[in-house]
């Protein structure tokens, strides 16, 4: 059964534009290779963080809306955790 999810992740500000694009493509690939379908990718760009994380106070924000099986978010979470440059991430199930 496919469910709708939304993920927001923040990449380290020291990454250049190419590295950010590569990371976004990597995460999109994880979703698509896991049988999910991407509905929307919204790159918010560099923004100030609400609070300092690891001595960093800004980062590159990206939002991805996708539809996937319930097992896929666990794999996506694992990939976020092992990827250098990801400061924070969250994956939530959309009920709407």
What positions do the PLM features span?
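Structured, basic alpha/beta domains of bacterial-type, RNA-associated proteins
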Residues: 2-96
């Amino acid at each position: 059964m496919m469910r709708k999810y939304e993920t927001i992740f923040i990449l380290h500000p020291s990454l250049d534009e190419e590295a950010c694009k590569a990371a976004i493509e990597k995460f999109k690939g994880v979703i698509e290779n896991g049988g999910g379908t991407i509905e929307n990718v919204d790159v918010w760009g560099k923004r100030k963080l609400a609070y300092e994380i690891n001595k960093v106070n800004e980062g590159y924000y990206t939002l991805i809306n996708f539809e996937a099986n319930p097992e896929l978010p666990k794999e996506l979470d694992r990939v976020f955790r092992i990827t250098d440059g990801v400061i924070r991430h969250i994956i939530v199930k959309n009920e709407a």
